[in-house]
């Protein structure tokens, strides 16, 4: 009652009492919650040391991966450089093989020249900061025959050599292995490498494509030779009294028999071995142009397409009148040069209506020309000669429709 009496006498006491009796908010300490059974003192979170260790481990792993990536990239680049080297050596060696065929060198002499050329050009290419040599040891430089049908390189056909295989090494005592940047870390300080390339002169010509531009021509003479005469030449049954030496014709045999391309008994009067490759207007100007410059793009377009054998291995060309004395100067100007001529099996018809059945294209060298005087004294003397046939169509059926003709050197493996 005393408290109530006091309030009645002084009403301000109500606000003071209210304030004194109002509950205060509880103070909650910032500690980690504990189980009721956990009597240990509170623990605070401290993990900065673990993150540092993990970071160091990740950096180490990344450094190893980076080192592997750099070395693998270097190996890849070096392998590409080595392949470029073997390609260069094989191409150069195969062109040297062609030159050896032109010069009539023996297989042993050709092999020596090929080896020199392979090393000369191969050693010009840098591989992993050094210049590897191509050594003529073991089977690193091999002559052989490349079969375009089976795509196999055969070393058992020496008479048909048309390809060169070159191996280039960077291993051991042969040019040394390729050094690596992080070899110590990865446990391997060097990497051995080998690259093999095969270059070939394909000699199964099946015809000729139409040149892509007007500036390109085919080195074909529009004069055909009968098959029997050509076979006699190949078999060595004709005379061998002339040869081309040091830029001139000499009266000395060279192991290659000659024949007279001037028409001799083709069986078609008025068509002494001349064929139309292009326009059929019998123009002496056209023939003169073809002798000097070759068969043009327009000439083949006049024939409605490429000059190609059919499935029976035959190509039909219309006959033109005999070789005119009007092209004597043009023929004399190409003495010593090589040309392609068609070989026919038979001819049917007379005059401009004659049709020649062409069965082969062959490479020859012009040695003598005489188109004036008595008929028996006229001649257009040629001998077999290896030559490059550009725009050639390659036969892929295993049949050969050419002699002494080769495509430009190409990489086949």
What are these regions, as identified by a protein language model?
Residues 125-126:
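Long, low-complexity intrinsically disordered regions enriched in Ser/Thr/Pro/Gly
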Residues 3-19, 27-38, 42-120:
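Alpha-helical assembly-interface signal, strongest on the long, hydrophobic N-terminal helix that forms
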Residues 58, 102-119, 133-140, 145-167, ...:
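N-linked glycosylation sequons
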Residues 129:
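Divalent cation-coordinating acidic motifs and surrounding scaffolds
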């Amino acid at each position: 009652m005393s408290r109530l009496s006091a309030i009645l006498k002084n009403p301000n006491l109500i606000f003071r009492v209210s304030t004194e009796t109002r509950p205060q908010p509880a103070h909650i300490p910032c500690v980690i919650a504990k189980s009721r059974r956990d009597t240990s003192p509170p623990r605070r979170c401290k993990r900065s040391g673990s993150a540092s260790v993990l970071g160091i481990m990740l950096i180490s792993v990344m450094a190893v991966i980076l080192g592997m990536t750099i070395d693998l990239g270097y190996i890849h680049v070096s392998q590409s450089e080595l392949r470029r080297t073997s390609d260069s050596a094989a191409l150069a060696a195969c062109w040297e093989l062609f030159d050896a065929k032109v010069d009539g060198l023996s297989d042993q002499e050709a092999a020596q020249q090929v080896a020199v050329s392979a090393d000369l050009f191969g050693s010009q290419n840098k591989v992993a900061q050094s210049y590897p040599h191509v050594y003529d040891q073991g089977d690193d430089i091999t002559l052989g025959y490349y079969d375009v049908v089976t795509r196999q390189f055969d070393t058992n056909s020496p008479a048909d050599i048309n390809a060169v295989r070159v191996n280039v090494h960077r291993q051991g005592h042969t040019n040394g292995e390729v050094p690596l940047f992080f070899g110590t870390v990865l446990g391997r300080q060097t990497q051995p490498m080998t690259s093999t390339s095969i270059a070939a002169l394909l000699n199964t010509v099946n015809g000729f494509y139409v040149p892509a531009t007007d500036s390109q021509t085919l080195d074909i003479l529009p004069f055909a030779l009968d098959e029997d005469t050509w076979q006699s030449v190949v078999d060595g049954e004709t005379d061998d009294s002339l040869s081309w030496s040091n830029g001139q014709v000499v009266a000395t045999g060279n192991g290659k028999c000659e024949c007279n391309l001037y028409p001799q008994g083709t069986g078609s009067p008025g068509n002494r071995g001349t064929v139309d490759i292009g326009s059929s207007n019998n123009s002496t100007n056209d023939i003169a142009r073809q002798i000097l410059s070759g068969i043009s793009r327009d000439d083949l377009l006049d024939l409605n397409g490429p000059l190609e054998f059919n499935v029976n291995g035959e190509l039909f060309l219309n006959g033109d009148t005999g070789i005119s004395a009007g092209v004597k100067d043009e023929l004399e100007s190409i003495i010593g040069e090589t040309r392609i001529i068609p070989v026919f099996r038979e001819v049917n018809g007379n005059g401009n209506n004659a049709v020649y059945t062409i069965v082969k294209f062959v490479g020859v060298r012009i040695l003598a020309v005489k188109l004036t005087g008595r008929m028996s004294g006229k001649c257009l003397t040629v001998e077999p000669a290896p030559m490059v046939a550009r725009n050639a169509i390659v036969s892929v059926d295993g049949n050969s429709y050419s002699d002494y003709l080769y495509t430009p050197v190409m990489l086949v493996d």
